[in-house]
């Protein structure tokens, strides 16, 4: 079946080399960070700014068993190692390097992070809001540091400024949830904000994909189908 893909079968080299720098991976956690689906691309691990805020809260929430938190941290570390070590990454892809669309198991890491963020959100009222403020401040510093690296695929406005805005907005929204004021409405507002962020990120990713590999027009597809229709 590989004969009909983007390239033919190739000899796989199981070398223990590092695939990317850790800061590169961190940048991919933010919205508007589309780079490429080509072989040199990084993992697609964006799953919402609110997830990045709640993830550290998961590890400092005493209501969650320490054994669960410890094992979750171990699994996160294992995924990061699998992404970054070439030989292990190839094993995940059936012992054959993928033709484009790298790290096809990244959805598993995203699912784990979402579950952890949900648990942290569920126990947010028992947390210390100062920790949320600290996490938001840390994310802001990380974003400024990422901006300084001048990645071609990290735009000032479409990624850095958008992410900073999301950090600030979600930081305020989580305070209303934490304080219990307008709790029902506050949770609904958080859900709406998440939807707006995801729509914006999806739109930016679609634009980035079109610039990267070009999304075929409907006319070109329709012309092809007319040739093969009976």
Task: Name every feature range the model reports, one short phrase each.
Residues 201, 229-230:
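Short periplasmic/luminal acceptor-recognition loop of GT-C membrane glycosyltransferases, typified by
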Residues 1-71, 78-79, 85-93, 98-107, ...:
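Periplasmic/ER-lumenal interhelical loops and adjacent helix-loop junctions
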Residues 73-81, 85-87, 96-223:
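Contiguous transmembrane helix-bundle modules in multi-pass membrane proteins
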């Amino acid at each position: 079946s590989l004969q009909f893909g983007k390239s033919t079968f190739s000899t796989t080299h199981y070398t223990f080399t590092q695939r990317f720098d850790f800061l590169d991976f961190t940048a991919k956690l933010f919205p508007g960070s589309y780079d490429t689906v080509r072989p040199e691309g990084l993992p697609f691990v964006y799953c919402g700014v609110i997830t990045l805020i709640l993830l550290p809260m998961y590890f400092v929430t005493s209501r969650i068993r320490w054994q669960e938190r410890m094992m979750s941290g171990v699994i996160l570390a294992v995924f990061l190692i699998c992404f970054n070590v070439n030989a292990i990454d190839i094993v995940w892809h059936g012992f054959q390097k993928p033709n484009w669309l790298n790290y096809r198991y990244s959805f598993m890491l995203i699912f784990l992070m979402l579950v952890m963020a949900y648990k942290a959100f569920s126990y947010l009222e028992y947390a210390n809001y100062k920790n949320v403020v600290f996490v938001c401040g840390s994310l802001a510093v990380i974003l400024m540091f990422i901006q300084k690296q001048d990645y071609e695929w990290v735009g000032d406005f479409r990624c850095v400024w958008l992410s900073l805005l999301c950090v600030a907005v979600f930081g305020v929204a989580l305070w209303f949830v934490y304080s219990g004021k307008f709790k029902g409405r506050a949770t609904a507002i958080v859900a709406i904000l998440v939807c707006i962020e995801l729509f914006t990120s999806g739109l930016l990713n679609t634009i980035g994909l079109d610039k990267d590999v070009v999304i075929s027009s409907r006319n070109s597809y329709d012309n092809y189908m007319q040739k093969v229709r009976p």
